[in-house]
């Protein structure tokens, strides 16, 4: 057999194998609330709060790291969780990209910490007007440094990889703080977790100790588009932090954060 033909056959087999490993969106939403599936597939965001009696893992995607974490955290008696799910069609500009090129775009979007700066949330107290949530954001040289570093950028999409970086995020409620951001990359999933590496304070009052907040963004590549699940978990704290000045509603505060992170991701991949 012609050597060139053999090479093409091998490449074809590898391509078919890679594509067959990518799930359909319909294969990973077996627990999703049936009444919300149609609107979810049209791009609506579904939000769940454990303190409202919602089973948050229900809106995470089957067989994913996000699902495993949602189940684990939901079942922890000393935590409360809140999550959201949305579906994002691949941008038209990605039509000519290979699977690996699309995956690389997603990875580098989630690595681009500096682009979080300026993302907004809708403030109901300000008359449903947008307000800046993160006024500053950048990658740090390491977790024990205050020195700003360039955003990390991968040159190729690994099939499987773990990576950690430190970041500085300044938000409208807790001010400037260090966070550790971990990335777990698998064949068709990029799982990003953000954990506070410093105490979170509201004015002069400590709202959360180091490590008590964990947020995640789980991007799952499907044949039809990107299934996105975001989760916030608060460990060992009451839902409301009371101070002599005012009360801080943590579920509301962190739903704003994961909603803003979702909006940031959607905006960045569509640029």
Set out the residue ranges of the language-model regions.
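Flexible, membrane-facing loop/turn or short amphipathic-helix motifs
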Residues: 200-207, 240-245
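Generic short beta-strand segments
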Residues: 186, 193-200, 232-234
């Amino acid at each position: 057999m012609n050597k060139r033909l053999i090479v093409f056959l091998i490449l074809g087999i590898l391509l078919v194998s890679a594509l067959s490993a990518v799930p359909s969106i319909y294969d990973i939403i077996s627990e999703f609330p049936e009444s919300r599936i149609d609107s979810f597939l049209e791009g609506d965001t579904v939000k769940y709060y454990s303190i409202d009696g919602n089973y948050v893992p229900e809106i995470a995607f089957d067989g994913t790291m996000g699902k495993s974490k949602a189940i684990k955290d939901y079942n922890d008696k000393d935590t409360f969780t809140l999550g959201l799910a949305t579906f994002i069609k691949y941008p038209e500009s990605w039509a000519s990209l290979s699977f690996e090129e699309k995956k690389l775009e997603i990875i580098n979007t989630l690595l681009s910490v500096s682009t979080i700066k300026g993302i907004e949330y809708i403030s109901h107290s300000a008359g449903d007007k947008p307000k800046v949530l993160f006024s500053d954001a950048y990658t740090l040289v390491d977790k024990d440094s205050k020195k700003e570093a360039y955003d990390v950028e991968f040159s190729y999409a690994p099939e499987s990889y773990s990576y950690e970086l430190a970041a500085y995020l300044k938000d409208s409620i807790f001010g400037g703080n260090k966070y550790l951001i971990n990335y777990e990359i698998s064949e068709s999933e990029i799982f990003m977790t953000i954990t506070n590496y410093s105490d979170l304070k509201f004015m002069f009052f400590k709202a959360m100790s180091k490590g008590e907040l964990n947020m995640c963004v789980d991007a799952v590549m499907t044949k039809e588009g990107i299934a996105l699940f975001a989760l916030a978990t608060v460990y060992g704290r009451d839902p409301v932090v009371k101070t002599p000045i005012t009360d801080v509603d943590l579920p509301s505060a962190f739903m704003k954060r994961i909603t803003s992170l979702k909006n940031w991701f959607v905006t960045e991949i569509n640029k």
